[in-house]
Amino acid sequence: MLYPALLCAALLLIAPLGHTEGRTLYPSPDAIQFVEQFLDRYNDLTLDDLENLVSSQPEEPSSAFTSGVKIAEYPKWADIPAQGDSTWLRLLKGTLANQKRAVTDRSRRGWNRGCFGLKLDRIGSMSGLGC
């Protein structure tokens, strides 16, 4: 009963002694350039700009259906986009909507209650020191 435990412990101690080589992954210059161009282009967009972009795009059939695959052969579990929005535009629109919602949530919470904030005012009211 003690032998399997000793064998496992010995294997665990010996395993790191083997020489292993790792390769460092570097980002592709093309990927970095793409991200920089993407951020330069879409950095100052507002939600209205995104809606204008979406409405100005021509309706294109989905690439899955242009390859000759009939709709009846397409699996039922596959999501077919209801709108002609591209994935990037929907992502950006959702992000901008979340930013606007975060600003209103922050103002609704009322971070600046009292003299020193909610926690310190609570401590001050319990101790009777107040502001």
UniProtKB/Swiss-Prot annotation:
The positions making up the signal sequence are: 1-22
* Record-level GO cellular component terms: extracellular region
Provide the gene name from the record. Answer: cnp-1-2
Q: Family per UniProt?
A: Belongs to the natriuretic peptide family.
- A GO molecular-function descriptor: hormone activity
Tissue expression remark: Expressed in brain and to a low extent in atrium.
Disulfide bond entries: C115-C131
Query: What InterPro entries does this protein map onto?
Result: C_natriurtcpep, Natr_peptide, Natr_peptide_CS
Chief location category: secreted
Asked if the record carries the keyword Secreted, the reply is: yes
Please name the source species: Oncorhynchus mykiss (Rainbow trout)
Alphabetically, which GO biological process terms does the record hold? blood vessel diameter maintenance; cGMP biosynthetic process; receptor guanylyl cyclase signaling pathway
Q: What name does the UniProt record give this protein? A: C-type natriuretic peptide 2
- Where can this protein be found? Secreted
According to its UniProt entry, the function of this protein is described as: Exhibits natriuretic and vasodepressor activity. Has a cGMP-stimulating activity.
The record's keywords, sorted A to Z, are:
Cleavage on pair of basic residues, Disulfide bond, Hormone, Secreted, Signal, Vasoactive
List the propeptide residues.
Answer: 23-109
